[in-house]
Amino acid sequence: MPFVEEEFEILKPTKALFFVRDVLKCSLKEAQRHLDKQRLKQNQQAVRKSQIIQGVVRLIHFKPNEKTQALVFETKDFGVFDKPHQVYTHPKGYFYHESLLDCIQSHFGKNAHPAHRLDYETSGLVLAGKTLQSVKDLKALFMQKKVKKTYLALAHGLVEKSMKIDKPILTPQNIQKDLHIRSKISPLGKQSITLVEPLSYNPFLDISLLKITPLTGRTHQIRLHLSSVDHRIVGEGLYGVADENAREYLQLKRENNAPLLMLHAASLEFEFKGAIYKIASPMPERFMPFLKDLSFFY
């Protein structure tokens, strides 16, 4: 795990802010951020930045590892990261879980941020700006639909031909309550379009490998659209299942035991400052067991 908890014994009275700065070799501002997130504790109590500490303390901090260090492409303005599955794009409050943002900022500094996001369950390419201005410019490309995103998905059933799924999606307003995290197809929702192209089929498992191109960017769009045409993604526990099963899935997710979702952001194409970029990610390892007995290619 990128977040580790280490124990330290402080022999002389020391200001907490200076202790964190010296241990992590960071700026005072960065040290203050760690303290604000309650990552330094003594006797199981969060330590304040102005507090003088001595004795045994425990510090939770980000320690990069190879899993989240997947920087696959870089320019002076941005980097592209290959996010692993079951990793958040952004951190959530005071919880100490894997976050791609920490990885991005460990590479490029505190002003670096993702220009878009992937679901926790989805792996693949994430574009990140190195400066506040480049983040703003890259986000504008996504808002203006000038970035072509393609995904790979393994879905249940035989998909015999390409299709266009055009169904409006209503995104949730209150994601804290029970199953309200789910988006839904509704005439009250925004127009949502997904292009689906079959690549191959495993007749023994009755699973299709699909190339997916979303033309809009609604929450859980690909997952919901495929479920709505009876081709639920392998590992999907939120859409196309009974409410009881969805609740069980969310509980397993909280326990980090949810099944792996077979959805991968495989490529990004865009123009930035006069240059055209096409960046691709290889087929993820978790797809491989499903692809051993492909009967044909389209």
UniProtKB/Swiss-Prot annotation:
Q: What reaction(s) does this enzyme catalyze?
A: a uridine in RNA = a pseudouridine in RNA
Give the CDD domains listed for this entry. Answer: PseudoU_synth_RluA_like
Q: Does the keyword Isomerase apply?
A: yes
The keyword Isomerase belongs to this UniProt entry's keyword annotation:
yes
Which Gene Ontology biological process is one annotated for this entry?
Answer: enzyme-directed rRNA pseudouridine synthesis
Positions annotated as active site in the UniProt record: 119
Under PROSITE patterns, the record lists: PSI_RLU
Key words, A-Z: Isomerase
Instruction: Name the enzyme group at the top EC level.
Output: isomerase
Instruction: State the Gene Ontology terms under molecular function.
Output: catalytic activity, acting on RNA; pseudouridine synthase activity; RNA binding
Q: Which family does it belong to?
A: Belongs to the pseudouridine synthase RluA family.
- Report what the protein is called: Uncharacterized RNA pseudouridine synthase HP_0347
Species: Helicobacter pylori (strain ATCC 700392 / 26695)
